[in-house]
Amino acid sequence: PHSPGEYTQGAGAVALLVAEDPRILVLDDAVGVSVESAADFFKPRRSFDKGELAAAVGGTLETAADHPFWATPDSVIEQFLEFPVFDGPYSNDCYVARVREALGRYEAEAGLRAMNDWFGMCFHLPYAFQGRRMWPDIALDLYAEQGLLAQVESEAGVTEAEAGGRKALAKAWSKSAAYKAYVAEKIGPGEAASMRVGNMYTASIFMGLVSALVGYADRRDLGGKRLGFLSYGSGSKSKVFSGVLRANFTAQLRGLDLEGALVNRRGISFAAYEALHARTAQGPLAPASEGAVLDRIETEGNLLGYRRYRWVQN
């Protein structure tokens, strides 16, 4: 709460089995990476002088030394904020720049072209339509490199000069029927689940894979076809890679109930959501499912802060 990056937040996890002889998707060797230092989204780590803090609360380190908060040998107290510092427009620009550069390096290494050789794409999605909104700026460069910009201009109904530049042409193209059809075929299946979950950070692109597999489950013709992955992490870094679907990949999806997992989630109130972030919630919001759960956190002696877990059997 109370962060400009709040609307990008989500929660979830995706588990994958990585095998030497996979039955669903075989990853290609080629990988493209782009890295550049950027403060587009980060959770600050701040340090405060311990003596100044003690004075601010009306005491001294000597009088407070027997309290575990003050008794550490460090001269500073560090604060790790969970509320991010976020610059949305700048982060979008970083996303496009990193993905475009990483994609170029991937294409050079793989000897492939995303526009021609990928039947679909999975994006890192900090919010629902990030991929489809950012892709026109990147795709126009790819079309231009292949001498196909006139095709985009025809679909957009305006030339680059008439639109007022490449970025304006990308915006016009993104509203065209041709681009909407492109999104429905190549991008939509991979973003459907994330639209209902939100940003899962590292897991986001793999939720895209799960979503795409479910979305393409009735496509028996996709064995041997290549799926592209475009990841991004603020700070900033992108990794682009691809994988080829196995001929019988649909047979491996029988136990995958994505819709059931989404429908059976437990909703919480906004007050509970705020309490979780403020760390004022004193207990779990839902009964524990089978597995290891936090039992208690020790509060005394050398065990101060030690977390104890117990196993719950349903």
Where do the protein language model's features map onto the residues?
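Catalytic phosphate/nucleotide-handling subdomain of diverse soluble enzymes
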Residues: 185-187, 210-263
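Condensing-enzyme catalytic core mediating Claisen C-C bond formation in acyl metabolism
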Residues: 7-105, 236-314
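Active-site-proximal alpha-helical scaffold in enzymes
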Residues: 1-2, 7-21, 203-218
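Cysteine-centered functional microenvironments
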Residues: 2-5, 83-91, 117-122, 187-200, ...
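Accessory "access/gating" subregions that flank catalytic or transport cores
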Residues: 116-190
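Feature representing long, continuous alpha-helical segments
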Residues: 128-132, 188, 195, 203, ...
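Phosphate/pyrophosphate-binding loops at sites that engage ATP/ADP/AMP, CoA/4′-phosphopantetheine
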Residues: 72-76, 100-119, 136-141, 145, ...
